[in-house]
Amino acid sequence: MEKHILILTTTKDFLWKFEGENVKTLQHLGYVVHYAANMNEPAYIADNRRLRQMGVRIHHIDIARSPFLFQENQKALQQVVELIRRYHIQAQHCHTPVGGLLGRLAGKQCADDGVVVIYTAHGFHFYKGAPLMNQLVYYRVEKYLARYTDILIVINEEDYRSALKLHLKKGGQIYKIPGVGLNGGRFRPLTDEERRQGRRALGIGPEDFFLVSVGELNGNKNHRIVLEALAQIRRSGNVPLIRYGLCGDGFFRKRMEDWIGELGLADIVTLYGYRDDIPAVLGCADASIFPSKREGLGMAGLESLAMGVPVIAADNRGTREYMEHEKNGFVYRCDDAAGFAEGIRMMMSLTSAQRAEMKLRCLDAVKPFEKAYACAVMRRIYTAVTRRIEEADQYG
């Protein structure tokens, strides 16, 4: 008898970006993998070709990123329930805040069907230092949804401690994993020749100090603070040869273009848009900047470190898992433009020996986050779910 599992997220690009190894594991265990997301968003991902190549069954649902778009999400909830019942889904693995909300509400509605519900929290919204409204609303929502959760997966220590205070469904389990795991074959230091050729292709001069950020252009990713830091450096009168490139796209692109113009940075800032050659760009950087206000873990920061490129990061629960100030980069408050400006200056002033030492510390910092560790935990989780499904079929 075929086993069916549903992976539920908000946007279609999530699966091939972050869940490829999980899909392979599930298929190896004999599952037919269904994937439900809003296939019309984001608009800058062109087609479903990569999803089809993964061998999953694709389902469009009208899920919205915002939990406050009630009409769309109510419709999406009913679509998820219909999928579960039509395809006899035996387990579902939901991701993203709204995916986790709808997936677990669907699990509640389908309780008699015995669906095993897994939720990966890629960063609770009731984190330390979060706005009071987050603490009041999101914690209560998570506390309520926990009772319909069989397996809760978190990706940082702060969230793990918070998860232990929640009451899951009877027999529920909590796991901490190192994110989706680093692909060491893809993210590794470039050779000197690869770096020279890459910088030449990007139009970066040999004397330029090249900064890179990777991430969607939105409010949380906080790229504005880097622009403010660069403007401060420029106003100081001591203007070094700095180039800043942003890899990513999103709803803030027009705002970013406006801010770049207003701050007089058009000659040094480049919006590269969405790219699928991130290692080639990151490896050419002298440093990366990761200014997010909130991160569950922050793979962009880890990927930079894995390439031996130090990071100027915002302090948040995700970066605390792997960043050490003045060891593998520099860490500042997410709203501290002067701090980020200082970090850029300090990074530029490193001697060759200091830069070599920092590179070694970068590579050491990412060892606990290698993909093998994350895959081993997920394999154990999915195997336990499979055993549970098979026992239910046997005695059901």
Predicted regions and their residues:
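Nucleotide-activated donor-binding/catalytic signature segment of Leloir-type glycosyltransferases, i.e.
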Residues: 257-273
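A conserved mid-protein helix/loop that constitutes part of the nucleotide-sugar donor-binding site
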Residues: 16-21, 209-234, 251-257, 338
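Aromatic "clamp/platform" in nucleotide-sugar-dependent glycosyltransferases that forms part
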Residues: 274, 293
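N-terminal strand-loop element at the rim of the active site
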Residues: 6-72, 158-167, 174
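Donor nucleotide-sugar binding/catalytic pocket of nucleotide-sugar-dependent glycosyltransferases
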Residues: 59, 146-195
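Conserved acidic donor-binding segment of nucleotide-sugar-dependent glycosyltransferases
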Residues: 325-326, 330-337, 346-352
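A short, well-ordered alpha-helix in the C-terminal region of glycosyltransferases
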Residues: 197-200, 346, 353-368, 380
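Short hydrophobic beta-strand element within catalytic cores of glycosyltransferases
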Residues: 310-313, 323
